[in-house]
């Protein structure tokens, strides 16, 4: 018994004692730390998707215009008064926003598809143009690009992910767009940078 006491007395000098106590403390914290950790579960991405720019979910945006002749009106507005917007009801995941302001955007991405009478033109949607402080999942404005000449629909999303590693960059993802209840097509949803 005295031999064990002497061995501990000589081996536990002040420096060793500190290391010994630190290790005991860390061992005692290990169960607490382990309980607080969560395992990665990819199913959570589908059960609880993130914000409006979540790349792991394909959302559907429904635009219901008050003007049934909205397409021709927006085309004329694009040529004669490009900043003019018309009101519509936007629905996303059951959330409905009344009186969002919609206009067509783009130049070549607007003109070229429109030359072949394609209704898949790019959109600029402003949530708080008519109603102050109205937001869609925390955003005031979104831009829906038609990915003209990009059959993969990935150019904007991949470049955004690369740029984001080095620069402050807007987010992008894909959405399905319906106008007046009719499927218009797959769009690239770009964050509007003010």
Where in this protein do the model-derived segments appear?
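Short hydrophobic targeting helices and cationic amphipathic motifs
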Residues: 3-6, 12
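Positively charged n-region of N-terminal signal peptides that target proteins for export
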Residues: 15, 21-23
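Sec-dependent N-terminal signal peptides
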Residues: 23-32
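Phosphate/dinucleotide-binding and metal-coordinating scaffold of catalytic cores
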Residues: 37-194
